[in-house]
Amino acid sequence: MTHISKPVGNEITCIMYGINDAILNNAEKIEKDLLDAAAQEDFEILKTVSYAFHPQGFTAILLLGESHIAIHTYPEYKCLVFNLYSCRGPEDGRKTLEYFRKQLNPSEVDIKEKRIKIDSKE
């Protein structure tokens, strides 16, 4: 018998275009904005890892009790890629993304959202 469970998680990927490259190279601002965004939904931040590339670009990962948030900047394209997965529920992450997006003020966004279903294979 196949059992299909309700969605147990949510994954959001967003590509943000038209961001000022001075912002995209400001690792401190982006990391603060990302932490503040995660606080919008009370995500449990277990660890933060970040790395600034030379001559430009930045990547950061927030390891969450609920899974992760990861970003990577492409200043040469005025672009940032945001990815969030949360196992708390199918609506999680939307407030986090919206807050983060407002801080960066992109001219255009491409958002893909996917409900993650886990089916018992036993």
Label for each model-derived stretch:
Residues 1-122:
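Polybasic/polar functional segments that serve as interface/processing modules
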